[in-house]
């Protein structure tokens, strides 16, 4: 009797039973697939986290030099973290005080300059940072720093809202001070080069992560206006190294008026060259190979003018 009832029930509801079975099978398949995906993602995240932990070694220099000692790194990181906290807390004056004297003088002469050109560009919101030793030698350590928005305070991360800079600390300094804005160090030189027409004094060298800049005084020892270069190309002002490698000047940042020197007068020019800090080539001379001896005559007939001279200015003793 019971078997008959069951048989009749199945016959009367065969379609419903079939649909239910299909739904259960589909549900089981979905659960299995979801479990596999979750497991894979969990393993991937674990592997990724482990890889990042293993690969991120902030004391190992990426470009040049020995790894930074743990004690030195912790000391440097404390100073950099202090700078960041001052900026996040809008304590601009204390952040500015942490800049080295040379950094202030060359890049941010006033606190308003620092506020406008650095602070307001980066710290429009609370930031955190990622630090990596970049270049290290006996005198200094350069760190690459990436400023990102603070996810703990915003809950968001935006790859487009990341700022990169290089921060340098002088190992020989007993002060808590930093170089920012890619500037690594400044060095007084006062090296003199003389010719019959020109006396040149290389006053100072400013070294950046990717460039070298020289401040030069040019004395005109003639009775004509001298033009140090026509700026028609970037091949006539070159930085030469010990192995004769040549680096061109950024002539687009030089004004013609700065290259004009009146008779018996002295002018000052700053010239920057694209020479990386990591290069092991030693800078030797700056070569001016197209100096116009008589600018007035040149202006009158530049096409036929040919009274030019050259000079190699020493940048090392």
Region spans (language model):
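Short, low-complexity N-terminal intrinsically disordered segments enriched in polar/charged residues
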Residues: 42-85, 89
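Short solvent-exposed beta->alpha transition segments
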Residues: 93-145, 150, 237-238, 243-249
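Exposed beta-sheet edge and beta->alpha loop/turn motif
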Residues: 136-217, 260-261, 268-317
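Asparagine-centered strand-capping/turn motif at beta-strand->loop junctions
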Residues: 216-225
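Short, hydrophobic/aromatic beta-strand segments
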Residues: 224-233
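Solvent-exposed serine/threonine-rich low-complexity stretches and specific carbohydrate-binding patches
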Residues: 247-258
């Amino acid at each position: 009797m019971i078997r008959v009832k069951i048989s009749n029930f199945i016959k009367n509801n065969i379609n419903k039973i079939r649909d239910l079975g299909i739904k259960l099978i589909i549900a089981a398949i979905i659960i299995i697939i979801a479990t596999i995906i979750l497991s894979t993602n969990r393993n991937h995240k674990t592997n990724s986290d482990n890889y990042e932990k293993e690969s991120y070694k902030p004391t190992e220099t990426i470009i040049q030099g020995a790894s930074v000692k743990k004690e030195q790194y912790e000391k440097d990181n404390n100073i950099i973290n202090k700078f960041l906290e001052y900026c996040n807390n809008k304590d601009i004056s204390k952040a500015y005080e942490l800049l080295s004297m040379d950094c202030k003088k060359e890049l941010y002469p006033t606190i308003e300059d620092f506020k406008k050109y650095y602070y307001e560009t980066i710290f429009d919101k609370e930031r955190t940072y990622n630090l990596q030793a970049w270049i290290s030698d006996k005198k200094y350590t350069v760190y690459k720093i990436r400023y990102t928005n603070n996810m703990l305070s915003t809950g968001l991360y935006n790859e487009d809202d990341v700022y990169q800079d290089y921060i340098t600390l002088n190992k020989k300094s007993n002060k808590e001070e930093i170089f920012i804005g890619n500037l690594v160090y400044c060095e007084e030189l006062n090296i003199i080069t003389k010719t019959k027409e020109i006396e040149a004094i290389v006053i100072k060298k400013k070294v950046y992560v990717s460039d070298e800049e020289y401040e030069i005084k040019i004395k005109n020892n003639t009775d004509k206006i001298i033009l140090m270069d026509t700026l028609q190309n970037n091949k006539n002002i070159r930085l030469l190294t010990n192995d004769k490698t040549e680096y061109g000047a950024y002539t687009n940042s030089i004004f013609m008026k700065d290259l004009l020197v009146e008779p018996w007068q002295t002018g000052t020019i700053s010239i920057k060259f694209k020479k990386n800090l990591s290069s092991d080539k030693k800078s030797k001379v700056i070569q001016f190979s197209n100096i116009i001896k008589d600018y007035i005559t040149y202006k009158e007939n530049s096409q036929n003018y040919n009274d030019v001279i050259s000079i190699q200015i020493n940048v090392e003793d």
